[in-house]
Amino acid sequence: MFRPKLLFTGLAALALGACSPQDRQAVTSAAIAKQVILPTYSRWVEADRQLAASALAFCQGTQELDAARADFLKAQRAWAELQPLLIGPLAEGNKAWSVQFWPDKKNLVGRQVEQLANAEQPVDAQSLAKASVVVQGLSAYEYILFDSKPEIADAARKARYCPLLSAIGERQKALAEEILASWNSADGMLAQMTKFPNQRYADSHEAIADLLRAQVTALDTLKKKLGAPMGRLSKGVAQPYQAEAWRSAQSMHSVRASLAAAQTVWVGVDDKGLRGLLPSEQKALADKIDAAYATSMKLLDDNDRNLGELLSSDAGKQFLNTLYDSLNVVHRLHEGELARALNIQLGFNANDGD
């Protein structure tokens, strides 16, 4: 009996099996762009829209401080998830610095926020866009909500900081919307990661290489975000104020969110991630990377202490060293064996020279 559906399925399977490596890379690039990157950018936009609304509500007295802080934490998490996906317009120029200023080795955030808050002319979103990136993003917003003394909920303090808080919320919303619109434009990143050749990529292999470079840079940055406060970059002297999001005690949560996003690029949705590009003879490498991610994620999931608490005890420091070493394994596997298996020359990453 003739079964056209089964025949079609069989032909499709044969066609898929006959796909060239280039075709598989094009499918993977498009899948990661549509199923991983674009949804993450969309969540970032929604979080920043809520942040802008939250700043306005808090400053108008219709939202409590705890709720304002919760909205900030959502925006912080959305940004952490985005960091392994920094390719295209957000990775160019100083746009990422405009979202979050880190590392801040000289407390520039605190000093410059106070200068703006004390200025005679109140800042607005338009003037903030022309100001230093130090005060445009989440680090400055975090300072106002978590570190300004006395409590920001005090009416007099609100009057002083609220113009800047509202301006940051609007600036972040506008920046996120601009980036997402650029991604979705006719010749934007979504199109460039889907159809080849184009102005950015001569072929799909270049797009996959760009994705891997972003992963390697992000994983290296995660190590730095742990290593700097641990003292690995300062002769063993702990530097807790060098941590990302230390004021809100969210450093460990941000590390986990970023690592989970990197793992999603590796695994993909419906197995259409970088992992799926490895041939069957590279199963041992795929298993090794799976295990490395699993080790790091378990360490993070089993931990319920913030970074400051971990740095204050010998047991906590040992845990951080174990976590750092596990992240190093993930990073080195991507930088070395995975890059070679995919025939990708990485060159320098964005952290080289830091």
Where in this protein do the model-derived segments appear?
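Bacterial N-terminal signal peptides that target proteins for export
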Residues: 1-8
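C-terminal motif of bacterial Sec signal peptides marking the signal peptidase cleavage site
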Residues: 16-18
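Mature extracytoplasmic or organellar-lumen-exposed domains after removal of signal/transit peptides
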Residues: 23-354
